């Protein structure tokens, strides 16, 4: 009964779709430097004391991926300052909540979406979303909201001429600096999630016109494949889909120890003592 109910749960694209959804979470946390440096345990029942490289509450989110070279260097520098400030008992500038992560049910932006910029010199222009950042609730729009910056910092020290190019800057979704485009009239709109007709999946609809805003195919791209149906399984490393869907566990009204005893042919001849609950 529990399995059949789980199969009827509607699919939620706003939770599943992300470029790094197959990236190991432990690796992502290590690149953020938000893992414990040392854990002081065995405190006679008291909770463990954790000394972090950088406390998760003090992590500074960015529109870049945590594993990019520039971000890793920034995280390493911040963790070193964080640790040295703890050792010398000095003041450390902790993170202030400049922007909070939006709830999954409120997030409606994905790579490949057609959006309209609402602020800046490109106000009123439309473009496609290149990347999204859930931690900072920002998006990058292709060719819009740009500023002139160095292509490679410190290139003159290496004997390379300094080159400049237009770099896209993040636009905040929570501050409504960018909005989705309604496919009905190609005007900016807000969107919400609602169940489709069969009731098996949530879809995006415009709050103004009620038209569905389909999710672009680029939103399904991950670092492992471009489309899920085109993924090629690696023999010897990937578990075949048939083996994953095969049902091998049969629930029993028995404890783990009793199941092992049944498999090994061990018979219990002792009489259990009465148990009292307070």
Curated annotation (Swiss-Prot):
* GO cellular component labels: mitochondrion; ribonucleoprotein complex; ribosome
> Ribonucleoprotein: present as a keyword of the record?
yes
Checking Gene3D superfamilies in the record gives: 2.30.30.30
Alphabetized UniProt keyword annotations: Mitochondrion, Ribonucleoprotein, Ribosomal protein, Transit peptide
Q: Which molecular function terms from Gene Ontology are attached?
A: RNA binding; structural constituent of ribosome
From the Swiss-Prot or TrEMBL record, state where the protein is found: Mitochondrion
Keyword Nucleotide-binding present in the record's keywords: the answer is no
The alphabetized list of GO BP terms reads: translation
**Primary residence:** mitochondrion
KOW domain residues: 109-142
Family of this protein: Belongs to the universal ribosomal protein uL24 family.
Name of this chain's protein: Large ribosomal subunit protein uL24m
Q: Give the species.
A: Caenorhabditis elegans
At the highest ranks, the source species' classification is:
Eukaryota, Metazoa, Ecdysozoa, Nematoda, Chromadorea
């Amino acid at each position: 009964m529990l399995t059949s109910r789980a199969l009827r749960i509607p699919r939620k694209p706003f939770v599943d779709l992300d470029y790094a959804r197959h990236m190991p979470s432990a690796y992502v946390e290590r690149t953020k430097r938000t893992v414990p440096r040392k854990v002081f345990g065995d405190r006679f029942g008291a909770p463990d004391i954790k000394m972090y490289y950088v406390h998760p509450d003090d992590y500074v989110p960015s529109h870049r991926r945590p594993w990019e070279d520039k971000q890793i260097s920034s995280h390493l520098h911040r963790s070193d300052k964080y640790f040295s400030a703890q050792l010398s008992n000095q003041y450390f500038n902790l993170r202030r909540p400049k922007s909070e992560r939006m709830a999954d049910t409120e997030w409606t932006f994905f790579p490949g979406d057609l959006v309209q910029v609402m602020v800046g010199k490109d106000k009123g222009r439309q473009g496609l979303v290149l990347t999204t950042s859930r931690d900072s609730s920002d998006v990058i729009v292709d060719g819009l909201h740009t500023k002139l910056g160095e292509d490679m910092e410190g290139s003159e020290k290496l004997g390379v001429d300094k080159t400049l190019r237009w770099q896209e800057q993040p636009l905040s979704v929570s501050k409504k600096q960018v909005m989705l485009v309604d496919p009905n009239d190609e005007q900016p709109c807000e969107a919400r999630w609602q169940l489709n007709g069969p009731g098996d999946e949530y879809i995006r609809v415009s709050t103004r016109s009620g038209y569905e805003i389909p999710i672009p195919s680029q939103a399904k791209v991950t670092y492992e494949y471009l489309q899920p149906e085109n993924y090629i399984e690696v023999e010897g490393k990937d578990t075949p889909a048939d083996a994953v869907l095969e049902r091998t566990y049969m629930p029993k009204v028995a404890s783990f120890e009793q199941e092992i005893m049944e498999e090994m042919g061990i018979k219990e001849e002792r009489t259990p003592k009465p148990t009292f609950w307070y």
